[in-house]
Structures are given as C-alpha cells and as structure tokens.
Amino acid sequence: MSHRDTLFSAPIARLGDWTFDERVAEVFPDMIQRSVPGYSNIISMIGMLAERFVQPNTQVYDLGCSLGAATLSVRRNIRHEHCRIIAVDNSPAMIERCRRHIDAYKAPTPVEVVEGDIRDITIENASMVVLNFTLQFLEPAERQALLDKIYLGLNPGGALVLSEKFSFEDAKVGELLFNMHHDFKRANGYSELEISQKRSMLENVMLTDSVETHKSRLRKAGFEHSELWFQCFNFGSLVALKAGVAA
C-alpha cells in the first residue's frame, strides 16, 4: 500500500543529499505521481513500445527500476515467448518492495529483480532497455559509458527508452518550464516548504542535461536514430533505435 508523501512537510534542520531510502520507498508512488508530470503516461506508453520492440528469445532491462512500474508495463505488453525481464536497482528498500509488487501480478514472462549498480550489469541479447528517470542520478562523466554498453548489448532493431528531467539551453524557456513544474507540484498539494526542501536535497545528486546533450551522447554511443517522443514541461522521454532488423 502506498502512503501519502509528507516527508518534507515540516522544517528539517539539516538537509542532506537525497537517497532512495526506506522512507522514500514507502511513499514513492504518491511522490512520483505528484512530482513528475506525465509519469503515468510514460509508464503506459513504455508498454506500447515494448509491444512493438520486444522480440522472442530476448531480454529486456529496466535499469533503475524503483518499484517496478515500467517492468510491469513491459511485461503486460510482451506478446512473445521465451523473453525475460531483468530489473535492477541499487536501493535495498526499493528492491524489497519491487519484488513484492512484481510477485503480486502473475504473467508468463519471468522477471529477475537484481539489487546492484546498473554500471556493473552486463547487457546482452537485449531487444529493449529502459532508463526511466535514472541516468540523471549518475555522475555526468559516467553517463556515456553506460549508453555505450547499452548500445553494444542491444540486438539489431532494439530500442532504448530514456526518460529524464531536462535542462534547457534557452534560459527563458528553462525558466518558464521550471515555473510550470513548480505550479504543477503546488496544484498537487505540495507546500512551498516541501518543494524547497526536496529541491535542496536533490540539487547535488540529480544533475540534468538538455535534450541536445542526450541526443549527442546517443549518437556517440552508436544509435542511428533518436527522438523525443514525450514531453511535459521539463520532463520527457526519448527513444533511441539501433539499426538493423530484429532476428
């Protein structure tokens, strides 16, 4: 059962850096729905992409799976046999709940839930990889290497879904979309104190990139095609395709 996010409703004397701990995991579904515009749309459409891209006898990776929402969306939409989903997160609290969540829904496609660092996971025989609001928590210098590894592990015709919070090279646009996101959180019941305290905790651990920077990295990794397929304010998702025809 998800609880309402009230973690930052009272003043916190010493704000540390953000961590996906037990307290966050407990309220995460409520938190992300009220904080990330378009999140539920992205989750459902990841399932639509899975229906199109997942191939028989291949693997799907959900890197930074949190509670498994994207994993479940993918699994509901796989139409082939002998597929496997590998869901990875480095938060013990998230992984514990993810396992329970996935076990509650029965489906023919097996899911392996792995507690570990996504940088250490071997990607192989993949028809689809999902990075759903995950890359932004890696050090910027480490992001290219992960994308390179994903490209190499994808089969021809495979797809990467990359969802992120964006920064903008046009400062005026960036300010507008930042303020729209602020209004979105306020409309969803967050107070100014809650918004401010959460932002202070995230600012050192969630470092955002522009869409142009993401596309540049994807090209460098080898992806022949990439495009923004969803955006709401300063949040969105890209799909990157590896050339070739799926076997």
Swiss-Prot record:
Cited CDD domains: AdoMet_MTases (cd02440)
List of residues binding S-adenosyl-L-methionine: Y39, G64, C65, S66, D89, N90, D117, I118, N132, R199
Single GO MF annotation: carboxyl- or carbamoyltransferase activity
Catalyzed chemical reaction(s): prephenate + S-adenosyl-L-methionine = carboxy-S-adenosyl-L-methionine + 3-phenylpyruvate + H2O
Enzyme nomenclature, EC number: 2.1.3.-
UniProt keyword S-adenosyl-L-methionine, yes or no: yes
GO BP annotations, alphabetical order: tRNA wobble uridine modification
Top-rank taxon: Bacteria
SUPFAM superfamilies per record: S-adenosyl-L-methionine-dependent methyltransferases
Uppermost EC category: transferase
Keyword S-adenosyl-L-methionine: yes
Keywords carried by this UniProt record: S-adenosyl-L-methionine, Transferase
Family to which this protein belongs: Belongs to the class I-like SAM-binding methyltransferase superfamily. Cx-SAM synthase family.
Known role: Catalyzes the conversion of S-adenosyl-L-methionine (SAM) to carboxy-S-adenosyl-L-methionine (Cx-SAM).
Subunit structure and binding partners: Homodimer.
Descriptive protein name: Carboxy-S-adenosyl-L-methionine synthase
